[in-house]
Amino acid sequence: MKLIILLCLVASSYALIGNTQSAGVRGKLICNGKPAVGVLVKLYDDDRGIDADDLMASGKTNGNGDFEISGHEDEVTPIDPKLNIYHDCNDGIKPCQRKFTIKIPDSYINKGKTVRNIYDAGVIQLAGSFPGEGRDCLH
């Protein structure tokens, strides 16, 4: 009987804490054929509904427009990783930055804190417009 109670407690505490999952993404950003330097990229766990998204990692593109970020989160259900890109390519003097999101496929979710399978977003030309693109002043 004590063993059953202990197993129930362990199982319920696991459900409350969740399990550690990770994701990572790399890519290259260009603006009109030139490296997009210093562009802010953020990796989130997309929490749908009223719960705020969980920031997993953030960084900026280097002098070649390259970036690579990864992070982890404890969740009971599978994480829903997404990459937000904030930029000013072809933006003129408009306030705030252009923002768009790339959803990371579930096949790139890793168990544990170590990312073994990183999503390669490829080369992204920022000069065009993207589905769901908006503006963000407070990122």
UniProtKB/Swiss-Prot annotation:
Residues 1-15 form the signal peptide. Its main location: secreted. This is Transthyretin-like protein 5. It is found in: Secreted. The gene is ttr-5. Belongs to the nematode transthyretin-like family. Pfam families: TTR-52. Keywords: Secreted, Signal. GO terms for cellular component: cell surface; extracellular region. Gene3D superfamilies: 2.60.40.3330.
